[in-house]
Amino acid sequence: MALLQIAEPGQAAAPHQHRLAVGIDLGTTNSLVASVRSGQSVILNDEQERSLVPSVVHYGVEEKKVGLEAFEQASLDPKNTVISVKRLIGRSLPDVQSRYSSLPYEFVASENGLPLIITAQGPKSPIEVSSDILSRLNHIAEQRLGGELSGVVITVPAYFDDAQRQSTKDAARLAGLNVLRLLNEPTAAALAYGLDSGQEGIIAVYDLGGGTFDISILRLSKGIFEVLATGGDTALGGDDFDHLIADWVIEQTKLKPQTANQQRELITLANQAKITLTNEKSAVISWQDFSVEISREQFNELIYPLVKRSLLTCRRALKDANVESEEVQAVVMVGGSTRVPYVREQVGEFFGKTPLTSIDPDKVVALGAAIQADILVGNKTDSDMLLLDVVPLSLGIETMGGLVEKIIPRNTTIPVARAQEFTTFKDGQTAMSVHVLQGERELVDDCRSLGRFTLRGIPPMAAGAAHIRVTYQVDADGLLSVTAMEKSTKVQASIQIKPSYGLTDEEVTAMIKSSFDNAQEDLQARELAEQRVEADRVIESVIVALQADGAELLSTDEFHHIETVLKQLMDVKQGSDRDAIAQGIKALDTATQEFAARRMNASINKALTGKNLSDIENP
């Protein structure tokens, strides 16, 4: 089964023509570009033979610098040197200001509330900054490959939401790149390892970078490559290891940094010690007038709580995937922080097997993306590889009573399209509001709103007679579109979801955990809401019936009795006793059964008035 054997419009070519395509790892700290050459995925180095391009842009008064040259300006001109822009992309200004208040930049809001960074070259959006980095990578690729690129595959974190993914695509288009696909970083890494070496079975991708941690559980079988579950922690990475060493040095020397420069110096020394401890049993840190020696055992003790935290996240991901650790056949290590021996040792013990480390963990994501780019651009028409990513949080719709009906459950493989039919609640209803939600809870107030739109032009009908088909579609890049259509008239409305800011993987994990912690309460709240909705429906129906036929078909005592039972249900509906509401509904149903029978007989008599048997048999 081949994956998306496509040709872009205008790109049809002879079968033997080789198109130039690359995979790009657009990282928070560093970025890389790779391509398949002579059947092998390789990193494309810059003019100085450097593989890593710092994800930094400096906007000077007279010139713009990208990469290492820009990074060297960070301490000299911090306000005009943009670092870690990946953390800002797809977020609102208030979100950026609350999360990253320590950043040296001056921000203003764009017309749509997104952050603009004030630089010597004017306001720059995170999309523009990312575009400049991508332009640099594009230049490196075209110089190395000797021609114009036909397409690129860009990797993104597994938890990037619609806004962050769309912003990444916008940045690529601004850089003049044809985006073949966005690919989850763990998926790319597993592709570089698993598919390239013929692996089959369950694969775990343990991705520990400088600032974040991601875990993905994947299944590879007969060419189908499926992400079963993902998890992560935005506050866990190699930078945290550096800070732990720095704090240890302060504790040993009793000296605290007095300036920002001293703090940067100490963190740099801590980072160097961490790197030394990768291959040596101890490292010496000389700071101020002191020299202290830290052993690998001491370092392991410092980072133990963080490594344990990552393994707890792994355990949750395995549970989501309904997989036991013993079933995992291979563990792929991604990210520079996985070079730490203690990390490899603990991950190996957790999964019961030695992790795969033969590919440079800094490069594995870009190498996997290059393999996928080579397939999508049409150079490997005989490929049987199929990649399936997943929806990290359930997608649903608001129904009566403030309830959430899940349309696409979390961890559903994408691309995916799911449809469900809904109906009107009131007689003569000609419009329906569609509220799109994200999350695992049962009530609207506990989930995240993604957007709203209104379907108008529904033919006036009795309540429940109209059929509205609502379709949720998530494409291969994780972007969501929702369409609502009234089936008899084909009138429809739709929305493409592009939230103004994104969710971090920490927030996604918190939302999932919240759904587990509140499962019982949520179920009770849902049952109560459903009873209230049913009560509203019954009350509405009885009121309409009384207004239409009550005076004609009921005696005064009967009318008052139904009104009394109706009032009792209206009162009990305001409470929180779902059993009492159910009893009230049953009581009203009993009280109105004779009335309903009389209405039915009256309707039949009216329909038959003036007709003989032959009219009925031969209408």
UniProtKB/Swiss-Prot annotation:
GO MF terms listed in the record are: ATP binding; ATP hydrolysis activity; ATP-dependent protein folding chaperone; unfolded protein binding
Provide one Gene Ontology biological process annotation: iron-sulfur cluster assembly
Extract the HAMAP family matched here.
HscA
The similarity annotation says:
Belongs to the heat shock protein 70 family.
What exactly does this protein do?
Answer: Chaperone involved in the maturation of iron-sulfur cluster-containing proteins. Has a low intrinsic ATPase activity which is markedly stimulated by HscB.
Highest taxon above the source species = Bacteria
* Keywords recorded for this protein, A-Z: ATP-binding, Chaperone, Nucleotide-binding
Name-wise, this protein is Chaperone protein HscA homolog
Name the Gene3D superfamilies on file.
1.20.1270.10, 3.30.420.40, Actin, Chain A, domain 4, Substrate Binding Domain Of DNAk, Chain A, domain 1
Question: Would the keyword Repeat turn up in this protein's UniProt record?
Answer: no
Q: Does the keyword ATP-binding apply?
A: yes
